[in-house]
């Protein structure tokens, strides 16, 4: 994954080394950090991050783009999804189909979305499995580090998904407080 949107090493969490800690400990810690910010502050930070994503040269040339429908505590992707869709890009979003599986579906507008049992807006429609056609993938996570390690929410959806899109350019996004020197792998 690429982390050119990551914070400078002076961010508060940068020097923290979680290699000796467990993944659940780090997830709890990140959740506590997120609670220190208001919804407005996270929205403001999201806009700054998404502006950088929009300017990314790999995104500009991509035709088929994997994004995620953000939850309230994640970098907000809703405007990005709409903008790229309006630009004529083919947008793919994840749909959780079981406790261990997610699949991709084509975004066809917000009216063709429904709220999942996890409270996430997901596209309706047919399963998409042409992974080789994906040019660009925006990857969320609970924490990342300088060695390109990612910590998710603990279900393994992206651990299983990322190897399927080996050709795609992958860009991880997170708030600065989610980026660490080292995280458990």
Describe each PLM feature range:
Residues 60, 149-150:
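Alpha-helical protein-protein interaction elements
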Residues 121-123, 140-143:
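A structured binding-face within diverse protein domains that lines the active/interaction site
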Residues 78-82, 158-163:
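Short amphipathic alpha-helical segments and helix-helix/interface helices
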Residues 74, 145-146:
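Short glycine-rich, flexible loops that bind phosphorylated cofactors or substrates
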């Amino acid at each position: 994954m690429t982390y050119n949107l990551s914070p400078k090493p002076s961010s508060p969490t940068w020097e923290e080394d979680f290699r000796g800690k467990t993944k659940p400990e780090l997830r709890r810690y990140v959740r506590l950090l997120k609670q220190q910010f208001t919804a407005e502050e996270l929205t403001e930070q999201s806009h700054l991050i998404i502006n950088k994503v929009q300017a990314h040269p790999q995104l500009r040339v991509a035709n088929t783009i994997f994004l995620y429908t953000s939850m309230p505590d994640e970098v907000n992707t809703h405007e990005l999804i709409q903008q790229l869709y309006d630009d004529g890009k083919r947008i793919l979003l994840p749909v959780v189909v079981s406790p261990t599986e997610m699949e991709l579906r084509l975004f066809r507008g917000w009216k063709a979305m429904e709220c999942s049992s996890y409270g996430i807006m997901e596209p309706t429609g047919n399963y998409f499995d042409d992974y080789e056609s994906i040019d660009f993938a925006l990857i969320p996570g609970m924490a990342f580090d300088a060695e390109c390690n990612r910590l998710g929410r603990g279900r393994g959806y992206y651990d299983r998904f990322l190897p399927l899109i080996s050709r795609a350019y992958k860009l991880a996004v997170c708030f600065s407080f989610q980026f660490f020197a080292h995280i458990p792998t």
